[in-house]
Amino acid sequence: MKFVDEASIYVRAGKGGNGALSFWREKFVAKGGPDGGDGGNGGSVVLVADEALNTLIDFRFTKKYIAESGEGGQGRDMTGSKGADLEIKVPVGTTVIDEDTGETLGDLVRDGQKLKVAQGGHHGLGNTRFKSSTNRAPRQTTKGTVGEERTLKLEMKVLADVGLLGLPNAGKSTFIRAVSSAKPKVADYPFTTLVPNLGVVKVKKHQSFVIADIPGIIEGASEGAGLGIRFLKHLVRNRILLHIVDLAPWDEITPAEAAVIAVNELHQFSPALAERERWLVLNKTDMVPEDELEERCQSVIDALGWEGKAYRISAISGEGTEVLCLDLMTALDEKRELLLESPEAREKEKAVRALIDEEGRNRIMSLREKRRKAGLLLDDDDFDEDDYDVEVEYVS
């Protein structure tokens, strides 16, 4: 199944049923009163988060969703049937945007969470409603109103506590294999990771966190090079970013240069995302001669102007990964407690995520517009083989 994290759909709620014009007719009742019933309300369109889904690919093929209209009223004060609501299942982690106004309608972040995106039309009134002491035989009715319609943009972002950032072949996939049961593809060539991979890291009994590996970014990614920029948005919901630096790169670039490139591209994509809490992880210590290790690590720290702790690990052997995961669990627990106890912290987190969303979306749309003008992108979308047949799933 292809991994698709964006889609546009058209939704229209059902029309309300018209009110009925009717009078009671019965043997020996010459002038029965009005008995026209109301129409039924139109069905609404509702999105429902489903944790069993992990891609928006279905919306690439079915783009129109129309809810059922309400039925018209009938005589004998019979109300028309209400149109059934149309429920559309989307993956957990889907952001819903009104494509015409740019307004974010909501985030579906919990399994079973619902979001009404188009309100059904209101029912029309039958002539019974207009009976009065001065008008015993009203012929007035009203029609049902039309339902709301919208063009929606759906954006799916994977839900993870920790996100991995780095250049291709930095060892991100090897790291996620080492600390969880996830088994992303690993090989000695760039862009082995083509879509996000998720793994559940179990630190202690009943203590775990989710980690996300996205395709590596390269120099010029913010201008459209490589695969990484379209996946950087998946880091929006991460509480901590792990910047993994390869101490033994296979090409001519130095570890210090690689570290600076990743940070610069992150800033270009979203300054707010670049300000997220970020930890430095120096990987492949086992592949560096012992007499060169200290100097190589220090070169990265100096190039970044890094003042915090720098973790030294070997993802392939597991050296240093246990301490790193324990520290991550402690930090994440502290962040969860703060969000639970402080409304101000929750509001701040919400505002930061919204800002990252806006900055990232604007950047991606700007690049797509440039590609369209250059004739590199079709008018409908960019659905191509870059998506690949890989599923994103939580593996514990």
Swiss-Prot record:
One of its GO terms (molecular function) is GTPase activity. GO terms for biological process: ribosome biogenesis. An essential GTPase which binds GTP, GDP and possibly (p)ppGpp with moderate affinity, with high nucleotide exchange rates and a fairly low GTP hydrolysis rate. Plays a role in control of the cell cycle, stress response, ribosome biogenesis and in those bacteria that undergo differentiation, in morphogenesis control. This is GTPase Obg. Pfam families: GTP1_OBG, MMR_HSR1. It is found in: Cytoplasm. Its EC number is 3.6.5.-. Residues 129-144 have a biased composition (Polar residues). GTP binds at residues 166-173, 191-195, 213-216, 283-286, 314-316. Its cofactor is Mg(2+). Belongs to the TRAFAC class OBG-HflX-like GTPase superfamily. OBG GTPase family. It comes from Marinomonas sp. (strain MWYL1).
